[in-house]
Regions:
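Alpha-solenoid repeat junctions
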Residues: 34-37, 69, 73, 152, ...
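Acidic, serine/threonine-rich low-complexity intrinsically disordered linkers/hinges in large eukaryotic
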Residues: 146, 169, 174-204, 414
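Catalytic glycan-binding domains that act on GlcNAc-containing polysaccharides
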Residues: 43-60, 65, 75-86, 91, ...
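TPR-adjacent "capping" and linker segments in tetratricopeptide-repeat scaffold/adaptor proteins
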Residues: 10-22, 50-57, 82-85, 177-190, ...
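Alpha-helical segment of the N-proximal tetratricopeptide repeat
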Residues: 25-36, 65-68, 188-214
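Solenoidal tandem-repeat scaffolds enriched in leucines and small polar residues
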Residues: 1-40
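Long, contiguous interaction/recruitment modules in multidomain scaffold/adaptor proteins
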Residues: 1-10, 153-174
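Alpha-helix C-terminal capping/termination sites
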Residues: 34-35, 70-71, 103-104, 137, ...
């Protein structure tokens, strides 16, 4: 059938293409095939299908091919987008039109694609940044700098990159005044807060988090800081971080970027010659420092290790008496996770962005997402096909920079940490030597 076996469906007689229903089924089959193999889908389309469709359908199909091709990093996707003509594209399609143009450093196409997005999408930090970069590349310095200036003061991946592009050093905001005893008592007395804390004590983390989020949703900065401090005192690190993250004018970055289990994590980072801010940045994103955290995929602990991975590493490093029930122990999880992170970094020339992508999605995928030629690190990250991994790498890398600032460590810029992602051929040549 068209959805289950699209290639077989497209290979059969095309008599049904004379009807609207038949053409719709063909589009279903082409769409399903294009998800895994855009080039084969285009081959079927060009072979004997394209001319059987009206113009509007042809443009729709080309836009679909182009979006799938861009996700697969196919250079020809740029031309496929052009074959879609002036058909209105969704913001998601325009995002991928932008991303494939970024991989080719086709700045006019980057600018054009972003400017076709809806106003809401254009004002997202990611597209403000890349539109600003495109303007700078095209010689419109004043306009490009003005755009980057809109987000340069924001504390996230693209805010930091924009600030660096404008030559603005990282400055941690002045620490807000510590919540007073009265402010803490006022927040602690809230019925929702009392329910949340009681649920946490009962081990009902999901229900407790829901209650917490509802309780803090309309708080001002002072109340948020008091709630974050209350979470810290109670060892509820995920709520401390997420609540402190919500402040607008008054900030406490020691609550946004805390270092629980500091001795354990720092010891393992030093033992494996890892950048400590990277380790803390990764743990902040993986588990929010919840020692017994478990994911839907079965990963456990501070550094979210799968049982199979943990067993393999434990054998490798000679950890005696290991069983997966020990993954909730910070010292065990950190020892295994630090070893794995070191191995991943070594496999990718020490590049933390590639290592983070590999840690989240697997080394094989991280390798496949490279280009034949060298890529700017930020472009590699923005063109990761998986939305979850793309956001994960951005968070880990931004976390690393802010932890370095809070901890007083290596003050390298985010751009320098991202580095240049060597082309696939260059890395293969190095591996063969």
């Amino acid at each position: 059938n068209a959805a289950g076996t699209p290639a077989r469906f497209l290979e059969r007689s095309d008599a049904d293409m004379n009807t609207a229903a038949g053409r719709e089924l063909a589009i279903v089959a082409l769409t399903r095939l294009a998800r895994s193999d855009p080039q084969s889908a285009v081959g079927f389309w060009n072979g004997r299908l394209r001319e059987r469709f009206p113009l509007a359908d042809r443009q729709y199909v080309w836009a679909m091919f182009a979006t799938s091709g861009a996700r697969h990093h196919l250079p020809e996707a740029v031309d496929w987008f052009k074959k879609a003509g002036e058909m209105p594209l969704s913001d998601e399609q325009l995002a991928w039109r932008t991303r494939i143009a970024l991989r080719q450093e086709n700045w006019p196409e980057v600018k054009n694609a972003i400017e076709r997005m809806s106003l809401i999408a254009r004002n997202e930090p990611v597209w403000i940044y890349w539109r600003g970069r495109s303007l700078l590349a095209l010689g419109a310095q004043e306009d490009g700098q003005a755009l980057l200036g809109r987000i340069a003061g924001e504390h996230h991946f693209y805010g930091r990159l924009a600030a660096e592009e404008l030559g603005m050093p990282l400055q941690i905001p002045k620490k807000a005044a510590t919540p007073t005893r009265e402010e803490l008592a006022e927040v602690a007395a809230l019925a929702g807060m009392q329910r949340a804390l009681a649920l946490y004590r009962l081990g009902l983390r999901t229900e407790a988090s829901t209650e917490w989020v509802w309780t803090v949703r309309k708080m001002n900065d002072r109340a948020l800081l008091a709630a974050a401090e209350l979470a810290r005192v109670n060892g509820i690190w995920d709520r401390a971080i997420n609540t402190a993250d919500r402040t607008v004018a008054e900030h406490d970055f020691t609550l946004r970027y805390p270092a629980p289990y500091g001795n354990v994590l720092s010891k393992q980072a030093r033992a494996r010659k890892l950048d400590e801010p990277l380790v803390f940045g990764l743990v902040r994103q993986e588990s929010r420092f919840i020692a017994d955290a478990k994911s839907s995929a079965g990963a456990s602990g501070l550094m979210q290790l799968l049982p199979s991975t943990a067993r393999r590493i434990a054998r490798k490093i000679g950890m005696k008496g290991f069983n997966t029930s020990r993954l909730g122990r910070p010292e065990v999880n950190a020892a295994l996770g630090a070893y794995y992170l070191r191995r991943v970094l070594d496999g990718f020339g020490g590049n933390p962005a590639l290592a983070a992508a590999a840690y989240n999605a697997g080394p094989g995928r991280a390798r496949r997402w490279r280009d034949e030629k060298p890529l700017e690190g930020a472009i590699y990250v923005e063109t990761i096909p998986f939305a979850e991994t793309r956001q994960y790498v951005k968070k880990v890398m931004a976390n690393t920079v802010y932890y370095a600032a809070v901890m007083g460590g290596d003050q390298r810029s985010l751009k320098s940490r991202l580095g240049t992602i060597e082309g696939a051929m260059a890395m293969k040549a190095e591996a063969d030597e």
